[in-house]
C-alpha cells in the first residue's frame, strides 16, 4: 500500500497528490503538566449547555465556508498499563512518604490491572484536516514540479523532492488564517507529526494490537526539518508495508487449514468459485495483513438520512458510543456558501416544475413525492436566505468497524446497520468499494470519485445536531480508578482525583445523595481509602451504631488508623492536652461556656476564663486541672467571684462524672494524637451514644436549657470533635486531608456541626482539604452545597427528592427521562450485579452514568459493605468490567499493545517500590 504522505512539517502534511493539509486535534485536553484543560462535556448536559455546544459547532462549520475539510473520529486503543500510569501520577515513592516497605497504593494499581486485563478499551479522539491554499505556494512552478515528482519518485525508488522554505512559510501563514477562523469555537491544537503518523498506523492495525496514542502524544519523531532552505523529511515508506485484500479469506470461516492441506489454496487472485469460500458479495470486509498480524474491518457508507428528526434524537455520532464495540467515522465535507447553494436549489426547483408538467399529461397525475420534494426545497431555500453566512454541508460519511476475525467484523457491521436503521438512517456496505472507503480514512488522501453517490445535503445547523464534533467524558484525567462509564458500550475506565482539585483551583468537596442501600457509604469508603493510600489523610465522623467506619479503618488502614470512640472513652479529647498554647485555651474556654451555658462577658465567664488561663500555664494543663483551679478559687476568693467559682466547680463536677464526658475530664486517658502527617492516615471519631438536642431547640434558649444532660453533653462534645476535624484538616496544606461526614443531617442539625461544614466548604480549598458528605436528600447538604465540585446521585425513588438531586447535579429536574433513570434505572432493587450505579459530576462539569467497583483487595472487601448478612471475612468474587456493564455477550480482544502495557506495568511497580 502506498502512503499519501510526502512531507510533514509540524501539523502541515504535504500529500503525494499535490495537496497540503493542516491537521488539528479537537478537544485536546491538558497538553503539558500543569497546563490548563478545556471544559469537557459529559453524556448528560443541561439544555443551555447543549445549545451552546451546538452554536460552537455551527460556528466552526460556517467559518470554513468554501473549504473541503475532513473530520476523523478515531477510537484509540487504551492499554491497562496506561490506566496504571495515570493512577500513580503525583504519588511519592514509598521511600519518601512511608519509609521502608511496600507503598499501599500498589495493591490498588495491581487490582485495577487485573480487572481491566483483556478488556476492549478505547477513547474517542477527534481530528480535523483542512486543505490549504496559498498563492505563493501552490502556484509556484517548483511546488507543482515537486508534486509531480512525488508520483514518479515512488515508482523509481527515489526520495520525494524537498519543499522550499518559501512554500513552507506560505502554507504556515495559510494555516494561521484557518486557526483564526476556528478561534472562538471548539478547543483545538495543531497535531504533532507522530500523531499524524499514528492516524495511519491506527487505520492499518484495526482488529490488532495497535501503537498507543499516548506514546505518539509525547514523541518527537516523524517530523521534517528545514535544512539549507529546503524541507527534508524522514521516509514514510514503512507505514505502507501492509497488504489490503477486499473479502480476504478468514481461516475460521473458510477452513483455510484444510484447504492448504489439500493443496487447493491457490495463489492470490484465483477465482473465488475455485476455492471453498463464500461469494464475494457476502464477504464485504477488508482484510489487512501487516507485520503484526491480520485484521478485518468493514466500511459502511451513510447512504440516506431521515428528512426530519427531533433535536433530542439527532445525535447520530453520540449513539455510536452505546455499541459494545468501537466505531471510527470519517466525514468528508464540502461546505458550499449560501449563495451558491441557493443557485443549486433554484435549478432543482426548475427541474421539479418540468417534471410536474410531464406528470400532468399522465392520467395518474403527479406523485406525492414531487410535492414533498418541492416543500423541502422551499424550506431549504428559506433557511439559506435567512443569513448570508449560512452554508450547505455536503458530507460523505464512512463508518468503520473491525475485529480480530472476519466473523466478528461482519457481526459488528450488521449490528451497526441495525442501530442506524432503527433511527431511520440507512448505511450500506458496498461490495467492491471497501478499499476506496478505507482510503478516505487516511490523512492526505483525495476523495475517490466513486463515493460521491453517498453525499448527503444538510444545512450547517442540522448537520451540527449529529454531534460529530463532540465527545463525552466523565471523571478526571487521573487519580483513583473508580469504575466504568455506563454510557459507553465498551469498557471505559472512570477516574477521579479529589486530592488534586485544590491544585487546579477547584473545590475538593463532594456530596453524595441517594436512598438507603444505594451505595453512598461504599463510595465514601472507596474514596477515603484512596485518599490515604495515595499519601493523604482521612478524618471520618461515624454516627452509626455498628461503628462501620471504625471497622473499615481497622482493616483497610491497619496500623495507620486511630479510632476515637466517644462512648467508650479509650482516649482523651481534652483540648488543653491536644492543642498547645492559645489554641488549647481557646477551644477549652469555648467548650466550657457551651457546656455550662454561661455568657463569656458575665462574672462567671470572667472567673472561668481566669481558671482556664491558670490551668493552661501549669506544667500539666488539662480540663481536670481547670476544675481544681475553680475549687481553689472558691476557697480563697470572696464575694461574687467566690460564688461564681463554687457554682462553676459544681456544674463541672456534674458533667465530669457522666460517662459521656469522661474522655474530656479523665486525666488518666492518653490524649488523641493529632500529628496525623507522621503517625496516622485515617482518624475515625465514632459518636454512637451521643445525643443532640432537637433542631428546633436551638432557636429557643429556654427550650435548649431544658434538654437532658446527655443531650447538652453531646452538643459540647460534638464541638470538640469538630475542632479536632478542623484542626487536623487545616494543619498541613501540603498534605491533602478529607473530612468524611456520612449521614450529614445528624451533624447539621446542630450549630456546631453546621459551622464545621460551612468552614470546610468555604476555606477547605486554600488549606488543601475537602468535605466528603453523604445524605438522603440534596437539601440536607445545606445551603452551601453549590460549593461542592464533585457530586454523585444514587437511586432515589421519591420523585421530589430525585428532582432535588438532579438540580444538585445541574441537570433539568423536570426531564422525565432523567427522572425515570434516577427513580428506577440506577441500581434497581433486587437485580444482581447492578449495585453501585451513580450519576457523577466532576469539577469540569461533565456528568455521566457510572458503575463503581470495589477492588479485589481483602483488607477492603472484608468490611466495606453494610448489607445485613453479606458481611464476610473473605473477599467476594468481583465481576469483570464487561459483565458489570451489562449482561450481553461481548467479544473481547487481547490486551492492546501488549509489550507497551507490560513495560507500563513494570514502570508502575518500579515507581512505587
Regions found by a protein language model. Give the residues of each.
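Conserved P-loop NTPase motor cores
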Residues: 492, 498-518, 522-528, 541-548, ...
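Switch/coupling segment of Walker-type NTPase motor domains
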Residues: 50, 73-98, 522-617
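P-loop NTPase motor domains
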Residues: 51-65, 439-493, 575-762, 769, ...
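Glycine-rich phosphate-binding loop of nucleotide-binding enzymes
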Residues: 14-19, 47-62, 479-564
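P-loop NTPase motor core of the ASCE superfamily
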Residues: 115-116, 580, 584-625, 782-913
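Phosphate-binding P-loop/Walker A region and its immediate neighborhood
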Residues: 109, 115, 201-294, 300, ...
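Extended, folded cores of ATP/NTP-driven motor/assembly subunits in large transport
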Residues: 1-452
Amino acid at each position: 500500500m502506498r502512503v499519501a504522505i510526502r512531507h510533514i512539517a509540524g501539523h502541515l502534511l504535504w500529500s503525494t497528490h499535490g495537496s497540503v493539509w493542516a491537521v488539528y486535534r479537537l478537544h485536546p485536553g491538558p497538553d503539558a503538566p500543569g497546563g490548563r484543560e478545556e471544559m469537557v462535556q459529559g453524556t448528560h448536559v443541561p439544555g443551555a449547555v447543549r445549545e451552546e455546544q451546538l452554536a460552537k459547532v455551527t460556528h466552526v462549520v460556517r467559518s470554513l465556508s468554501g473549504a473541503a475539510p475532513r473530520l476523523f473520529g478515531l477510537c484509540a486503543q487504551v492499554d491497562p498499563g496506561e490506566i496504571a500510569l495515570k493512577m500513580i501520577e503525583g504519588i511519592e515513592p514509598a521511600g519518601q512518604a512511608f519509609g521502608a516497605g511496600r507503598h499501599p497504593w500498589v495493591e490498588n494499581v495491581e487490582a485495577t490491572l487485573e480487572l481491566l486485563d483483556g478488556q476492549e478499551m478505547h477513547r474517542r479522539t477527534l481530528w480535523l484536516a483542512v486543505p490549504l491554499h496559498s498563492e505563493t505556494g501552490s502556484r509556484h512552478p517548483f511546488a507543482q514540479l515537486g508534486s509531480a515528482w512525488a508520483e514518479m519518485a515512488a515508482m523509481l525508488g527515489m526520495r520525494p523532492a524537498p519543499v522550499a522554505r518559501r512554500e513552507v512559510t506560505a502554507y504556515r501563514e495559510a494555516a494561521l488564517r484557518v486557526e483564526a477562523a476556528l478561534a472562538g469555537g471548539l478547543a483545538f491544537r495543531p497535531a504533532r507529526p507522530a500523531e499524524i503518523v499514528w492516524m495511519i498506523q491506527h487505520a492499518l492495525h484495526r482488529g490488532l494490537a495497535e501503537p498507543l496514542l499516548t506514546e505518539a502524544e509525547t514523541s518527537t519523531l516523524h517530523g521534517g526539518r528545514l535544512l539549507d532552505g529546503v524541507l527534508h523529511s524522514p521516509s514514510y515508506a514503512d507505514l505502507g508495508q501492509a497488504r489490503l485484500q477486499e473479502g480476504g479469506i478468514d481461516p475460521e470461516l473458510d477452513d483455510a487449514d484444510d484447504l492448504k492441506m489439500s493443496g487447493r489454496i491457490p495463489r492470490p487472485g484465483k477465482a473465488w468459485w475455485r476455492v471453498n469460500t463464500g461469494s464475494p458479495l457476502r464477504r464485504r470486509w477488508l482484510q489487512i495483513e501487516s507485520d503484526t498480524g491480520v485484521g478485518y474491518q468493514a466500511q459502511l457508507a451513510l447512504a440516506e438520512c431521515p428528512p426530519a428528526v427531533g433535536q433530542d434524537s439527532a445525535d447520530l455520532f453520540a449513539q455510536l458510543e452505546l455499541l459494545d464495540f468501537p466505531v471510527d467515522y470519517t466525514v468528508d465535507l464540502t461546505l458550499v456558501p449560501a449563495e451558491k447553494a441557493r443557485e443549486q436549489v433554484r435549478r432543482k426547483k426548475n427541474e421539479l416544475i418540468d417534471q410536474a408538467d410531464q406528470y400532468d399529461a399522465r392520467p395518474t397525475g403527479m406523485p406525492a413525492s414531487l410535492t414533498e420534494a418541492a416543500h423541502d426545497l422551499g424550506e431549504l431555500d428559506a433557511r439559506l436566505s435567512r443569513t448570508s453566512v449560512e452554508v450547505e454541508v455536503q458530507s460523505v460519511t464512512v463508518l468503520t468497524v473491525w475485529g480480530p476475525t472476519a466473523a466478528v467484523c461482519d457481526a459488528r457491521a450488521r449490528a451497526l446497520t441495525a442501530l442506524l436503521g432503527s433511527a431511520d438512517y440507512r448505511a450500506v456496505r458496498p461490495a467492491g468499494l471497501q478499499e476506496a472507503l478505507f482510503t478516505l480514512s487516511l490523512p492526505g488522501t483525495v476523495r475517490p470519485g466513486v463515493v460521491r453517490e453517498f453525499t448527503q445535503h444538510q444545512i450547517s445547523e442540522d448537520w451540527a445536531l449529529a454531534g460529530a464534533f463532540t465527545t463525552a467524558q466523565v471523571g478526571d484525567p487521573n487519580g483513583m480508578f473508580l469504575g466504568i462509564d455506563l454510557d459507553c458500550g465498551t469498557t471505559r475506565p472512570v477516574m477521579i482525583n479529589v486530592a488534586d482539585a485544590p491544585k487546579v483551583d477547584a473545590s475538593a468537596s463532594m456530596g453524595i445523595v441517594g436512598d438507603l442501600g444505594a451505595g453512598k457509604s461504599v463510595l465514601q469508603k472507596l474514596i477515603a481509602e484512596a485518599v490515604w493510600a495515595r499519601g493523604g489523610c482521612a478524618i471520618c465522623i461515624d454516627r452509626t451504631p455498628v461503628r462501620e467506619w471504625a471497622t473499615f479503618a481497622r482493616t483497610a488502614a491497619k496500623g495507620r488508623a486511630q479510632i476515637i470512640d466517644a462512648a467508650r472513652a479509650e482516649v482523651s479529647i481534652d483540648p488543653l492536652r491536644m492543642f498547645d498554647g492559645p489554641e488549647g485555651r481557646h477551644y477549652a474556654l469555648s467548650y466550657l461556656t457551651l457546656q455550662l451555658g454561661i455568657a463569656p462577658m458575665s462574672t462567671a465567664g470572667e472567673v472561668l476564663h481566669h481558671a482556664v488561663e491558670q490551668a493552661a500555664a501549669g506544667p500539666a494543663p488539662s480540663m481536670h486541672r481547670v476544675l481544681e483551679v475553680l475549687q481553689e478559687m472558691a476557697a480563697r476568693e470572696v464575694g461574687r467571684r467566690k460564688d461564681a467559682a463554687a457554682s462553676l466547680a459544681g456544674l463541672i463536677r456534674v458533667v465530669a462524672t457522666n460517662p459521656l464526658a469522661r474522655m474530656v475530664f479523665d486525666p488518666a486517658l492518653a490524649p488523641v494524637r493529632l500529628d496525623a502527617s507522621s503517625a496516622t492516615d485515617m482518624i475515625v471519631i465514632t459518636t454512637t451514644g451521643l445525643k443532640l438536642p432537637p433542631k428546633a431547640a436551638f432557636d429557643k434558649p429556654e427550650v435548649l436549657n431544658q434538654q437532658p444532660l446527655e443531650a447538652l453533653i453531646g452538643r459540647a462534645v460534638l464541638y470538640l470533635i469538630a475542632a479536632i476535624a478542623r484542626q487536623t484538616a487545616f494543619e498541613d496544606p501540603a498534605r491533602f486531608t478529607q473530612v468524611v461526614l456520612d449521614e450529614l443531617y445528624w451533624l447539621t442539625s446542630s450549630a456546631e456541626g453546621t459551622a464545621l461544614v460551612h468552614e470546610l466548604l468555604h476555606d477547605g480549598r486554600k488549606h488543601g482539604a475537602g468535605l466528603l458528605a453523604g445524605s438522603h436528600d440534596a437539601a440536607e447538604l445545606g445551603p452551601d452545597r453549590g460549593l461542592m465540585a464533585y457530586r454523585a446521585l444514587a437511586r432515589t425513588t421519591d420523585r421530589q427528592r430525585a428532582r432535588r438531586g438532579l438540580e444538585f447535579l445541574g441537570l433539568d429536574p423536570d426531564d422525565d427521562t432523567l427522572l425515570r433513570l434516577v427513580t428506577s434505572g440506577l441500581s434497581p432493587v433486587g437485580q444482581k450485579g447492578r449495585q453501585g450505579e451513580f450519576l457523577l459530576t466532576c469539577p469540569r462539569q461533565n456528568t455521566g452514568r457510572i458503575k463503581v467497583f470495589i477492588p479485589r483487595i481483602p483488607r477492603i472487601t472484608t468490611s466495606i459493605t453494610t448489607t445485613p448478612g453479606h458481611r464476610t471475612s473473605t473477599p467476594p468474587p468481583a465481576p469483570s468490567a464487561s459483565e458489570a456493564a451489562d449482561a450481553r455477550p461481548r467479544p473481547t480482544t487481547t490486551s492492546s499493545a501488549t509489550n507497551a502495557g507490560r513495560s507500563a506495568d513494570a514502570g508502575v511497580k518500579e515507581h512505587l517500590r
